[in-house]
C-alpha cells in the first residue's frame, strides 16, 4: 500500500509536535480506522522502564493503581498525584518479562523519570528511559490473518494484555464505549520504519495523529495536559477503576493524594465532569484551554478540539458538575462558538457516597 501524499507535520505549537498530522486525507484516514485498518506513528511519546526485584511493590507504593502483583502481560493505566490529590502524571503501564514499561506524554517523560529516580531510596529498582516507539493501530481488519502474520502473532491478545514481539510487545487496549479494536505496538525506535512497512504490505493504511485524536475524543478518553488542568482530580475525568478498567484503585494502601481520593469518593460529588461537546463549525475554531460559558459566566474549560469524520467539530471539556445537557454553551474567541453537550457523555446518575449519606441522615435529608 502506498502513501497517498507526503506527510503533513503536526503543528509545532501543539502537543504532537514532531509527529505526522495526516497524509493528505485526514477524514479518509479516520474512516479507515472505523472500517479497515490504520497504523499511526506515535513515537513521540515517552517510554520508560523499571527493572529490579522491587519494581512492582515500589511503584505500587507511590502511585494510584493496584500494581504490586500485576500479572505477566497485564496492562493498565496509572497516575501520580500531588499532595492535594491533583493529577500530575498519567501513564500506560505494561508488565512483561521482568520489566515494567511506562509510556506517557512526550513532555512528561523527563519529569516523570526524574520523580521516579528521586523516590527509589533503598529499593531494588532502576528507572530508565527506553529508546522505544509506540505505533497505534485502529480498525476491525487488524484481526485478519495478513495483519496477524505481519505482527508475528497467532492471535490478538486479550483486552488490557500484551504479548512479546521482536524486541518489544503488542498490547491490546480496552475497547471503550464504541467497542472498537485498538492495539499499541511498542518496538525499538530504530525498527519502527520496518514495522510500518511490514504493516503496509499487509494492507494497513498509514495515518496521522489527527485520526488518533478524533478516535480518542469521540471515545471520551482524556489526555493529560489537554483535557486536564492543574486542578484536575481523577474522579472528574473517569480515571477511577482497578487494573485494566481505570487508573485509581479505591482499595489500596497509602499514596500521595489518597486522602482527597477517599474523601471525594465518600462524598460522591467531584466538582467537575468530563463531557463531549459538539461545536458550531461555522465560527472560528476554539482552542484548548478556552473558557466554556453559559449565560455569560464561565462554567468550564475546553480540552482537545478536533474535526471528526462523522461527528464534525467536537471537543472534550471539563464542566461544572450537574450542568444540564440542554444548557446553551459558548466558547472560543469572544465566546462566539456555540456548543452543546452530548447527553450520552454525561456521567451516570450520582450515587450518594457513604460519608454524605451519613451527614444527610443526621440532617434528616435521607431515610
Question: Positions of the model-derived regions?
Answer:
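Short amphipathic beta-strand starts and helix->beta connectors
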Residues: 26-35, 76-90, 120-121, 162-173, ...
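Acidic, low-complexity central loop/insert segments
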Residues: 38-39, 47, 89-223
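Glycine-rich, small/acidic residue-mixed loop/short-helix segments
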Residues: 4, 231, 237-248, 256-258, ...
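Anionic-ligand-binding alpha/beta catalytic cores of soluble enzymes and soluble regulatory domains
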Residues: 186-278
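Glycine-centered loop/turn motifs
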Residues: 72-74, 154-165, 220, 225, ...
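A common structural junction motif
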Residues: 66-67, 117-125, 199-210, 294-299, ...
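Short, surface-exposed ligand-recognition loops at beta-strand->loop->(often short) alpha-helix junctions
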Residues: 50-55, 137-143, 278-287
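Acidic, proline/glycine-enriched N-terminal capping motif
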Residues: 4-76, 81, 86-88, 367
Amino acid at each position: 500500500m502506498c502513501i497517498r501524499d507526503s506527510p503533513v507535520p503536526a503543528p509545532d505549537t501543539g502537543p504532537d509536535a514532531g509527529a505526522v498530522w495526516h497524509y493528505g486525507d485526514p477524514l479518509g484516514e479516520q474512516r479507515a480506522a472505523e472500517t479497515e485498518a490504520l497504523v499511526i506513528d506515535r513515537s513521540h511519546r515517552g517510554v520508560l522502564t523499571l527493572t529490579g526485584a522491587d519494581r512492582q511493590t515500589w511503584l505500587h507504593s507511590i502511585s494510584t493503581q493496584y500494581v504490586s502483583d500485576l500479572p505477566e502481560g497485564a496492562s493498565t493505566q496509572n497516575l501520580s498525584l500531588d499532595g492535594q490529590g491533583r493529577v500530575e502524571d498519567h501513564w500506560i503501564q505494561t508488565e512483561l518479562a521482568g520489566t515494567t514499561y511506562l509510556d506517557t506524554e512526550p513532555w512528561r517523560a523527563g519529569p516523570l523519570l526524574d520523580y521516579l529516580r528521586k523516590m527509589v531510596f533503598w529499593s531494588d529498582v532502576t528507572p530508565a528511559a527506553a529508546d522505544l516507539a509506540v505505533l497505534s493501530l485502529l480498525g476491525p481488519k487488524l484481526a485478519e490473518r495478513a495483519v496477524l502474520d505481519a505482527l508475528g502473532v497467532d492471535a490478538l491478545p486479550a483486552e488490557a494484555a500484551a504479548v512479546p514481539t521482536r524486541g518489544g510487545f503488542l498490547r491490546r487496549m480496552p475497547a471503550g464505549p464504541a467497542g472498537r479494536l485498538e492495539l499499541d505496538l511498542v518496538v525499538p525506535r530504530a525498527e519502527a520504519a520496518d514495522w510500518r512497512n511490514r504493516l503496509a504490505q499487509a494492507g494497513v493504511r498509514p495515518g496521522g495523529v489527527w485520526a488518533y485524536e478524533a478516535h480518542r475524543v469521540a471515545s471520551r478518553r482524556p489526555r493529560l495536559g489537554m483535557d486536564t488542568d492543574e486542578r484536575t482530580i481523577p474522579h472528574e475525568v473517569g480515571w477511577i477503576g482497578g487494573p485494566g478498567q481505570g487508573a485509581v484503585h479505591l482499595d489500596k494502601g497509602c499514596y500521595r493524594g489518597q486522602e482527597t481520593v477517599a474523601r471525594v469518593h465518600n462524598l460522591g460529588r467531584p466538582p467537575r465532569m468530563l463531557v463531549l461537546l459538539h461545536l458550531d463549525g461555522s465560527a472560528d475554531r476554539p482552542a484548548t484551554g478556552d473558557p466554556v460559558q453559559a449565560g455569560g459566566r464561565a462554567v468550564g474549560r475546553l480540552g482537545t478540539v478536533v474535526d471528526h469524520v462523522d461527528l464534525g467539530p467536537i471537543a472534550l471539556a471539563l464542566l461544572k458538575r450537574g450542568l444540564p445537557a440542554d444548557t446553551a454553551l459558548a466558547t472560543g474567541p469572544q465566546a462566539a462558538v456555540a456548543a452543546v453537550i452530548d447527553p450520552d457523555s454525561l456521567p451516570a446518575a450520582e450515587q450518594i457516597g457513604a460519608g454524605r449519606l451519613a451527614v444527610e441522615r443526621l440532617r434528616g435529608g435521607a431515610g
